[in-house]
Amino acid sequence: MTMKDITTALGELSDNLRTPFMLSYQGYKYEEISTHLKIPLGTVKVRIHNARKELMQKLEAYKFHDK
């Protein structure tokens, strides 16, 4: 798996998932993300969880594709 694979997988996420995930990755707290995006805290948590889950699935596919 390469950085290109990771970048591609991130690019395949919907904006609704990618934006809170990337803000979290950049060090913002969930509460800060909630305020910045003007969405409920629970929604932030669900979107980040779903983004992680989707990324893992996509990266697993790349891992098997490389073999």
Regions found by a protein language model. Name each.
Residues 37-61:
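DNA-recognition helix of helix-turn-helix
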Residues 1-11:
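Acidic, proline/glycine-rich intrinsically disordered inter-domain spacer in sigma factors
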Residues 11, 15-18, 26-43:
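Helix-turn-helix DNA-binding module
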Residues 9-12, 23, 58:
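Short amphipathic alpha-helical elements of helix-turn-helix/winged-helix folds
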Residues 65-67:
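Intrinsically disordered, low-complexity basic tails/linkers immediately adjacent to helix-turn-helix/homeobox/MYB/SANT
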Residues 6, 20-21:
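Short alpha-helical "packing" element that flanks the helix-turn-helix/winged-helix DNA-binding module
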